């Protein structure tokens, strides 16, 4: 097995683990919303999980590249120049899905849970729209809704100074419902963000390795000596 095949196999196993993690993490808030909410249209904690960043972005869109990468370990029909090229091509889909998962997670972390929303816990701010994702402002990404002592939407802070931000930072505990919502929202979407980042790195590396494997070739089966 060449270096390209070994790295491709490692990428396949890594992507498989990340797919499972992304799907499970995304399903946790969905399950809670189905159990606690009277209807499935609103979640008392959040609503960004209904954009399915872990199920679609980090899950379904990474399956083709994962399948092709794992096939390299078996030295089957996929273990040739064409197979390596396809693994590189399918990894582009993985990269797109990982970016989608990251953008949704960043948007969710920017807005905070519904209990921190100033519009009476409305789901309007997280209505599905690619335009909303394109409006992400890195400068407003400060997580004040999580680290501040009180749950206030980041948009309610006007030009906060660094000293004020540091002095008001406080890790929420689970003593109140508000803090539990903040901790749960932060944990879920920070985890999905990390899954998306890792999938992006593995996807980019597989694009490079698959391209090199396509150019340099792969190992052949040794003929059995009878």
UniProtKB/Swiss-Prot annotation:
A cellular-component GO term for this protein: focal adhesion
Cytoplasmic topology ranges: 36-49, 105-191
Keywords on record: Endoplasmic reticulum, Membrane, Transmembrane, Transmembrane helix
Topology relative to the membrane: Multi-pass membrane protein
Positions marked as site (Cleavage): 13-14
One GO biological process term: negative regulation of proteolysis
UniProt key word Repeat: no
Any single Pfam family the record assigns to this protein: L6_membrane
Lumenal topological segments: 1-14, 71-83, 213-226
Domain of life: Eukaryota
Keyword S-adenosyl-L-methionine among UniProt keywords: no
UniProt PTM: Glycosylated at Asn-132, Asn-148 and Asn-163 in presence of ceramide which inverts the orientation of TM4SF20 in membranes exposing these residues to the endoplasmic reticulum lumen.
Subcellular location: Membrane; Endoplasmic reticulum membrane
Family, similarity comment: Belongs to the L6 tetraspanin family.
Function (record text): Polytopic transmembrane protein. Inhibits regulated intramembrane proteolysis (RIP) of CREB3L1, inhibiting its activation and the induction of collagen synthesis. In response to ceramide, which alters TM4SF20 membrane topology, stimulates RIP activation of CREB3L1. Ceramide reverses the direction through which transmembrane helices are translocated into the endoplasmic reticulum membrane during translation of TM4SF20, this mechanism is called 'regulated alternative translocation' (RAT) and regulates the function of the transmembrane protein.
Protein name: Transmembrane 4 L6 family member 20
Organism from which the protein derives: Mus musculus
Annotated gene: Tm4sf20
